[in-house]
Amino acid sequence: MIVAQRHRFRTGFTAALFCLILFCSVRAQDGPPHEEKKREADLVELTKLNKTIKLDIRYARTDNFTGQAVYPEARAFLQRDAAKALLRVHKKLKKDGLGLVIFDGYRPWRITKLFWDVVKLDERKYVADPAKGSKHNRGCAVDLSIYDLKTGSLIPMPSDFDEFTERASPDYTGGTDEERANRDKLRKLMEAEGFTVNPNEWWHFDYKDWQDYAIYDIPFDKIGRRKKP
């Protein structure tokens, strides 16, 4: 009984501390960097484009590098043009009995700020500097992999998602032939549709027109709602 109470206390304390970090990190910088003459956000939900696009939104769970759920729900959005390009990749994969699985898409700026504050200093190359904003904040970056449509399982890759090691590099030469072939297949298909792979993360791709959009901090439940005049 005492052990269970201690576990609940530690869990509750960790969650409370995490919420405090989130609050303080946002207050430390009141909002995202302001940019002029940017296109209005046109974020669309990926699963509404095609029901066979699979979600594995670990930031809505605790099995991510923060150890806490930072999203209130498992949803994924991209700017419309990027989403259409992604759908074309998905349709090409379906011919081989495969499909895209999404780890993350549009990310509110305050979450980028949180990541920056909680990650270790020597691992900050894997997260975006909130002072500059992330392409995820613009709705033009996506973290993804490939899954087998029949089994629902992820196909082998050289590393797991959000693994902060050299194995995460898109040019990593280790691992098995199958893992590297799968990784390179994903990269080839994504680059053919206007995406560029992140040099540190094989799963992270940026869409070509990301500079057209501002750095947003729109909560998921506010996406698509127009402001009243």
Question: Which role does the model predict for each range below?
Answer:
Residues M1-R8:
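N-terminal secretory signal peptides that target proteins for export/translocation
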Residues P108:
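Segments that shape or occlude catalytic/ligand-binding pockets
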Residues F9-G12, K208:
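Alpha-helical and His/Cys-centered functional microenvironments
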Residues I111:
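Short, well-ordered surface patches within globular domains
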